[in-house]
């Protein structure tokens, strides 16, 4: 039995996408209501939204241990065709221009807003491709150069059944590099494998969790989205079967 109330009230991650749609490397579009805002107005909107959502959680007695500012923000966030207000970070096509300073400032804006509501919450900057050290050095060098405020470097990792060993090795090496290079804690914020490859998924997760535990600065490994069952709604990387029961993959978290 899974107690969602317990999960929600004790240790949880709150992830703000700052978009009308699911934000990921292919889509970091700002909310329609924020179109046309100046840079200062965008930051004010980010602050207000972040504080509103977190205050609502606080009112319900929910205290997130961690809060993400953005979701898989390797290509930046709050894209715009106008460089003056864009938070793009390249790699997202010529339509959405790069502005390293804005991206860094958006991260800081979100972080400051989080701390105003939950001073003890740790703020995560979360990127895709946890095995891609070049991406992580690129983004976090930029954040360092611009004095961005955050606490934790978060990663996603979604290997296939034939790539998990090499990707796990690369991800672990990347985490160690992030700790050494930036003196930050790290976390696997998202991990997953096809629900119908449960035995291989368990083997992968067991190895990833064991190696992550050996890194003192690694805060944990989170599966996304385990309760998506049997390819529900086209999503195949959950960890529940077609009957709605957990697969053996979840046993890896018992270690």
Stretch-by-stretch model annotation:
Residues 1-7, 11-13:
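Short, small-residue-biased leader/transition segments that mark boundaries at the very start
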Residues 18-21, 71-76, 128-133, 157-163, ...:
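Solvent-exposed loop/turn segments at secondary-structure junctions
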Residues 116-123, 130-201, 210-213, 217-218:
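Glycoside hydrolase catalytic-domain groove-lining segments
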Residues 15, 67, 153, 190, ...:
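Conserved, mostly hydrophobic/aromatic
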Residues 23, 84-95, 170, 177-183, ...:
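Aromatic-rich peripheral "rim/lid" segments of glycoside hydrolase catalytic domains that contact
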Residues 8-10, 58, 107-119, 175-180:
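Surface-exposed amphipathic alpha-helices with a cationic face
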Residues 17-25, 50-96, 124-126, 219, ...:
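Active-site groove signature of glycoside hydrolases
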Residues 32-46, 96-101, 158-165, 192-199:
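The substrate-binding groove and active-site-proximal loops of carbohydrate-active enzymes
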